[in-house]
Structure formats: C-alpha cells, structure tokens
UniProtKB/Swiss-Prot annotation:
Protein name per the record: 1-(5-phosphoribosyl)-5-[(5-phosphoribosylamino)methylideneamino] imidazole-4-carboxamide isomerase
Catalytic activity: 1-(5-phospho-beta-D-ribosyl)-5-[(5-phospho-beta-D-ribosylamino)methylideneamino]imidazole-4-carboxamide = 5-[(5-phospho-1-deoxy-D-ribulos-1-ylimino)methylamino]-1-(5-phospho-beta-D-ribosyl)imidazole-4-carboxamide
GO biological process terms, semicolon-separated: L-histidine biosynthetic process; L-tryptophan biosynthetic process
Keyword Amino-acid biosynthesis: yes
Matches recorded under InterPro entries: Aldolase_TIM, His_biosynth, HisA_bact_arch, Isoase_HisA-like, Isoase_HisA-like_bact, RibuloseP-bd_barrel
Pathway: Amino-acid biosynthesis; L-histidine biosynthesis; L-histidine from 5-phospho-alpha-D-ribose 1-diphosphate: step 4/9
GO cellular component: cytoplasm
Localization, UniProt: Cytoplasm
Organism placement in taxonomy: Bacteria, Bacillati, Chloroflexota, Dehalococcoidia, Dehalococcoidales
Predominant location category: cytoplasm
Superkingdom of origin organism: Bacteria
Broad enzyme group: isomerase
Similarity comment text for this entry: Belongs to the HisA/HisF family.
Amino acid sequence: MEIIPAIDILGGRCVRLLQGDYAQETVYSPDPVGTAMRWQSLGAPRLHVVDLDGAADGESVNFELIREIANSALIPVEVGGGIRSMDTVKKLLTAGVDRVILGTVAVENPELVREICARYADSVAVSIDARNGKVATRGWVNSTEVDALELARSMKKLGVKRFIYTDISRDGTLSEPNFAAIRDLISAINMPVIASGGVSSLSHLRLLKDIGAEGAIVGKAIYTGDLNLKRAFEELS
C-alpha cells in the first residue's frame, strides 16, 4: 500500500486546515518545496499536493510552486485543487505532474471528466470528498445532495480508473479514517481507492491495507509527529 504524504499549499506556504475550514489553518512551513524534499528523503513513494487557493478560486493559483515540486522530486507527484478545465490538466501534466485529481468538476461537469479520461485516463484520479455521505465541492465550501457512492459509480462509467475518498469531518482531526465508508466504496466500484482524512497512526494504516485501500494520504499526523513516517514506510510500503 502506498503511503502518500500531503502537501497543502495556501498563500505559497505549507499548511494544514481543520476539516477543510480555511479559517482554521496552521502553517507548518514557508517552504513547500523543501517539505516535499523532506518527505521524499524519508522514503515517500509519491507526493499528494493540493493547491488550496486553487480549490477555492477554481483555477490553478500556485502553479509555479507545483511545477518546482514536480521538477525537483524524483518520485511521482499528484496534484489537486482548482483543476476544472482541459487546459489546466494539460498544463500540469506538461509541467511534470504525474496525476491530476478532479473533484468539483466531477459533480459540475461530468462530460469534461469523460473528455479528460479519454485522453489521460491513467493520469487521472477523482476525489470523492464527503460530509455525512454527501459530496462537497469548491474547496469543500459548497455542500451538495450528491451521494458519494453514486458519484463514484457514475465516474467509473465515464472512464475514471482511480478514486480518492476523503471524509471531510475527519480531515485534520487526528481521529481515525472512516473505515466503513472506505470499505463500502471499494466494494461498490471494485477500483483502486486511496483513503484520506483522519489517518494518524500505524494501526490506521494497517487497517486500511487490510480492507483493500490502494493507498493512504497522510497529512496532519506527519506534521505534528503523531505518525512516524519513516517507520510507516518501512512497515507497510
């Protein structure tokens, strides 16, 4: 199972939010590129980079920083946040990004997801970001009545080959992942699923591996030191 460190960028800095709330940010580093190199040096197989400004604004805001991370890293970099056009997808992939993550556009413009997958299926993941089983969009600010499992099923039909599942209520809380929801998603679509939100211990990672998650995104716990990343790589990767 891939254990994927998260680097969330807001205002050019590496931050963590509590439950996706932009008013509750903690700055962990003024240097996202240096942070990326640190996680790589500990053995990360991949990096998960989120442009939080982009997620809120609907377009790539921290593009130059993201390109620098992608070009500096020797490991694959996946990027989400504000990717809502074919041009942005092309721009990121051309800049060296390995995988683009689509969120809002999956709800608001599924036809575009179909077009993106027709060209770049192996370089796409759709992020299912849920609050009480319902999908949230636009940097998790906008709540919808779209059911998380139904969205995943419809995206699979459009050619999506990989999913990320985030339980927003657990993100940044150091509580635990929503194991039941992740298990339900894996069994519903029978596709690779990467778990996110609340992953904060080795036992969480072992459980996610046991229920069949392809990977786990680790955020706040590696910045606070609650999760020893090097040990996690040694034991589970």
